A protein has these predicted regions:
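Concave beta-strand-loop units of leucine-rich repeat
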Residues: 1-12, 16-56, 62-99, 105-145, ...
Length: 221
């Protein structure tokens, strides 16, 4: 028996709604039990979505924060996600994007979290938001091999890199005078951890070829 779609009409009659957290699929089902039309929810400022059942999310132009997990976009870039001058926080987990193209449409973004995005390979577009970006977290995005764009992110205050990708070096830290915290589990190929010494809080995974241990690094928060 196929259940009728859930009726979201009452939701659209709430013009003062600012926050919406929406999961439309059960673990044992392949299809959502309805579709939310975000073109009819123009005043939202914070949205959290998961999986299928989300229509017209790019119409959300007043968002300050957007979080998505298991979301599948057509373009496989940030063109599939909300953007705008007000957007400051973006968190994407297990999504199908391949690049960050389109991030320049959110020129005031401050905080970007990228987690378990298995198809993401190209983060070079980050230089387009270097002026605004303050915090960047990249975790378990194994296809990213080129982190050279980090040299352009001179206003970062917090940087977290988690995964098995080898960083050639961490010389990019010298270009981040405002950096307060740096944490990584990634192997650093040249083994030189001295750039960490200038950072108030730094954490690395100990490896035999590193010239410093994690315990040698500052832990001031």
């Amino acid at each position: 028996t196929v259940r009728p779609p859930f009726d979201f009409e009452p939701l659209y009659g709430m013009p003062n709604l600012r926050y919406l957290e929406c999961w439309l699929m059960r673990e044992d089902e392949q299809q959502p039990f309805g579709t939310v039309d975000y073109a009819r929810l123009q005043n939202l400022s914070e949205v959290v979505v998961e999986g299928k059942g989300h229509s017209n999310i790019t119409n959300l132009k007043k968002l300050r924060s957007f979080q998505a997990s298991d979301y599948r976009g057509v373009n496989k870039t940030l063109a599939d996600y909300p953007s705008g001058d007000l957007l400051e926080h973006l968190s994407l987990t297990s999504c199908n994007l391949r690049s960050l193209d389109g991030i320049e449409k959110s020129p005031n973004i401050k905080d970007l979290e990228l987690t378990y995005n298995r198809s993401l390979a190209d983060i070079s577009a980050l230089y387009k938001v270097a002026d605004s970006l303050r915090a960047l977290s990249v975790e378990a995005c194994g296809k990213i091999q080129d982190f050279s764009v980090l040299h352009a992110l001179t206003n970062l205050e917090h940087l977290h890199l988690d995964g098995s990708t080898h960083l050639p070096d961490i010389s990019f830290l010298a270009n981040m005078p405002r950096l307060k915290t740096f944490a990584t589990t990634m192997p650093i190929a040249d083994g030189d951890l001295r750039p960490c010494l200038a950072i108030p809080y730094a954490s690395v995974r100990n490896r035999k070829h590193h010239n410093l241990k994690d315990s040698d690094l500052s832990k001031r928060l």
